[in-house]
């Protein structure tokens, strides 16, 4: 993410950078993690107090698209190694959709450098080798950036960290597949498998699905990411295919049209909702009617869900929602105005 002074003539001349130059010497790059080293950035933030929140998670990781280079700059593989954009991407002989080089959509992207994991990947991942839990991207580059009414992978390569998730509100990679589990559940497995300390987390993070918590009481960006992941095939295969529509319905009258759109798209991926009629820019009354209609469809599907008696999903013994607990989460929804600038 670059910055320019409006007084400069960059609109006519552009940036001074030319291929082969030192980019940092010619183009100011906003890096919140280096605030102390960038006095010019401190001045900019003072004049634009919402700037960082519009683009970054609280710890400085990007939360929107179009700024993937920022993620690379914060990645140890780049800082301590030779990783660059072209380590994975190619301008030629690639799919224009993602411009990934040959086989870079697979674990080869990481194993080309981290070759020691190739022989016994499951020993590292603790998941079956062919499962989504053994896909390097899913753990180390989860979909935590909002983009084009969807979610895309973070380009800051890191590892699941419950303490960071609790502190920043950024979804944890483990919970994005295991959408039916709590943050505490993740902390216990990371401790068992990788000896990561178990941090103290809020009561809700001990008892309720982490994704569900973001969906119901997160800010608009968190709600959109949570909704997208409830419709993500990799998540549904792990977390079930039945409980999600009841909670996606809660977003059909969300204050943000973008959130409503993402929720609707996820909802249509579930059985019984493929032809669900809905206009995400309809009147408030129509949005509320659609929400009620979705709830009725879900309830008519029956209560013999595999997820019945799942307190972390707010479901009682009969597979119905604990309405009081649901409302308590909705009452805590973060309605702080937010704009995620891609």
Regions found by a protein language model. Name each.
Residues 1-235, 279-290, 294-298:
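Primarily the internal scaffold of c-type cytochrome electron-transfer domains
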Residues 204-212, 238-252, 273-281:
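Amphipathic alpha-helical scaffolding segments comprising HEAT/armadillo-like alpha-solenoid repeats
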Residues 224, 228, 246-250, 261-265:
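Solvent-exposed, polar/charged alpha-helical surfaces in well-ordered, non-transmembrane soluble domains
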Residues 229-232, 265-269, 297, 336:
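Core register positions within helices of long alpha-helical scaffolds
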Residues 253-259:
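Short coil/turn segments at helix-helix junctions and helix-capping linkers
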Residues 268-272, 283-285:
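TPR/TPR-like (Sel1-like) alpha-helical repeat modules
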Residues 307-342:
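Eukaryotic intrinsically disordered, low-complexity regulatory tails and linkers enriched
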């Amino acid at each position: 993410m670059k910055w320019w002074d409006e007084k400069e003539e960059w609109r006519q001349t552009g940036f001074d950078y030319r291929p082969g130059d030192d980019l940092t010497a010619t183009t100011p790059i906003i890096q919140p993690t280096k605030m102390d080293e960038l006095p010019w950035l401190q001045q900019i933030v003072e004049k634009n107090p919402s700037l960082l929140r519009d683009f970054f998670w609280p710890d400085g990781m990007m939360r929107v698209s179009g700024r993937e280079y920022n993620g690379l700059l914060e990645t140890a593989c780049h800082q301590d190694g030779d990783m660059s954009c072209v380590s994975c991407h190619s301008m030629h002989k690639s799919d224009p959709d993602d411009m990934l080089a040959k086989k870079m959509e697979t674990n080869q992207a990481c194993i080309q450098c981290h070759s020691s994991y190739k022989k016994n990947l499951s020993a590292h991942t603790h998941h079956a080798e062919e499962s989504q839990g053994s896909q390097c991207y899913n753990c180390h580059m989860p979909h935590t950036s909002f983009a084009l009414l969807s979610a895309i992978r973070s380009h800051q390569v890191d590892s699941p960290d419950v303490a960071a998730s609790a502190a920043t509100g950024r979804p944890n990679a483990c919970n994005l597949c295991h959408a039916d589990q709590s943050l505490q559940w993740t902390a216990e497995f990371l401790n068992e498998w990788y000896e990561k300390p178990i941090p103290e987390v809020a009561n809700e993070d001990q008892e309720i699905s982490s994704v569900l918590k973001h969906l119901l009481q997160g800010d608009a960006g968190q709600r959109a990411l949570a909704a997208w992941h409830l419709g993500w095939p990799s998540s549904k295969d792990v977390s079930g295919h039945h409980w999600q529509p009841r909670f996606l319905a809660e977003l059909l009258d969300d204050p943000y049209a973008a959130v409503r759109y993402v929720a609707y798209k996820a909802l249509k991926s579930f059985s019984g909702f493929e032809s669900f009629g809905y206009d995400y820019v309809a009147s408030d009354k129509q949005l509320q009617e659609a929400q009620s209609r979705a709830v009725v469809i879900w309830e008519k599907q029956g209560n013999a869900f595999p997820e019945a008696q799942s307190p972390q999903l707010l479901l009682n013994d009969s597979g119905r929602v604990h309405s009081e607990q649901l409302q308590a989460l909705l009452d805590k929804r973060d309605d702080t105005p937010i704009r995620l600038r891609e």
